[in-house]
């Protein structure tokens, strides 16, 4: 049975849950929690629940949701629906600018705006000439910077975990993800990019144009930096090319498996995939997304192999 805590109080025995699904991803997607309580007697309304309240779900053998924050409460026939996510405060569009700064400085400040603490794992502090948040939320800016710096990040329990991709791939396995012959599963692989070229166009009086590449000739990924990011020079551009190349290739392969049990993994976990029917899929992998259905005790786990 799942344990549901609302504002620090265990309410599991006081509510009849008909839906409880936690969906968490890496790559800067915010974990979400969707619940439905059957409440024929109208008790829930007397609790004065409101957006911003804290809620958490845990179950034996499953990854816990960590603290989530209510974003929407909807009375429905015979009950209530609650939607929550892992951000303590909404990601409100804003205009901010940093000059002669570094990746960790900007990432830390963007996380703080969201009510999060940034923790860096194996990340180099990449310099930037300037970064501008241009009437948009903090999350997309942070995601872009992480991509250029060769990092990914996920949000969990009040913390933005920013991980260098090579650091994440070097971690030891924390367990086994079994893909049984009877399981519903899929894995896709697309051709990997071998070269990334980035063109930073010149802006009069602001920056010079820079073109840089990383990799080997073959299947090229070409990109442009918009006016919200300014690099210091060619060496930094090459690092950005490497980061963008790694990010693009990570998205070109991956799979999932459905299970009749809850997943113990959270995004970013390293595990060992065992697939008897397709041994080529077996080996070390990084979990990229988890969807735990606490009420039906089922899960869907997405992963990508570590080359």
Segments (PLM) and residue ranges:
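Charged- and aromatic-enriched interaction segments used to assemble
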Residues: 77-183
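Short, surface-exposed ligand-recognition loops at beta-strand->loop->(often short) alpha-helix junctions
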Residues: 38, 42-44, 98-101, 260-263
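Short solvent-exposed loop/turn micro-motifs enriched in small/polar/acidic residues
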Residues: 48, 66, 144-148, 189-191
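Assembly/oligomerization scaffold segments
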Residues: 1-91, 180-182, 254
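Short beta-strand and beta-hairpin "edge-sheet" elements
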Residues: 56-83, 272-297, 302
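Glycine- and charge-enriched low-complexity intrinsically disordered segments
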Residues: 98-100, 303-307
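Acidic, small/polar-enriched beta strand-loop surface segments
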Residues: 1-8, 143, 155-157, 164-298
């Amino acid at each position: 049975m799942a344990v549901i805590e609302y504002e620090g109080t265990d309410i599991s025995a006081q509510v009849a849950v008909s839906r409880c699904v936690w969906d968490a991803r890496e790559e800067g997607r915010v974990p979400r929690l969707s619940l439905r309580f059957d409440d024929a007697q109208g008790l829930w309304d007397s609790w004065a629940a409101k957006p911003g309240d804290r809620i958490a779900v845990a179950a034996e053998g499953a990854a816990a949701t960590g603290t989530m924050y209510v974003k929407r409460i909807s009375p429905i026939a015979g009950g209530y629906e609650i939607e929550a996510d892992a951000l303590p405060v909404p990601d409100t569009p804003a205009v901010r600018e940093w000059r002669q700064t570094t990746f960790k400085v900007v990432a830390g400040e963007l996380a703080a705006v969201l009510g999060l603490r940034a923790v860096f794992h194996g990340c180099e502090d990449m310099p930037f000439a300037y970064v501008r948040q241009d009437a948009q939320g903090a999350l997309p800016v942070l995601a872009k910077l992480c991509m250029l710096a060769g990092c990914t990040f996920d949000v969990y329990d009040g913390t933005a975990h920013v991980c260098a991709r090579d650091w994440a791939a070097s971690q030891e396995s924390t367990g086994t993800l079994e893909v049984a012959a009877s399981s519903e599963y899929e894995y896709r692989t697309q051709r990997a990019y071998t070269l990334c070229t980035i063109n930073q166009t010149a802006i009069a009086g602001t920056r010079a144009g820079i073109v840089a590449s990383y990799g080997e000739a073959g299947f090229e990924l070409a990109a442009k930096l918009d006016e919200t990011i300014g690099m210091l020079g060619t060496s930094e551009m090459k690092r950005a090319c490497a980061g963008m190349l790694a990010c693009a290739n990570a998205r070109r392969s991956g799979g999932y498996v459905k299970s009749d049990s809850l997943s113990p993994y959270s995004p970013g976990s390293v595990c060992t995939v065992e697939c008897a029917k397709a041994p080529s899929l077996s080996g070390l992998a990084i979990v990229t997304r988890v969807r735990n259905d606490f009420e039906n005790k089922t899960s869907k786990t997405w992963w990508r192999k570590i080359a």
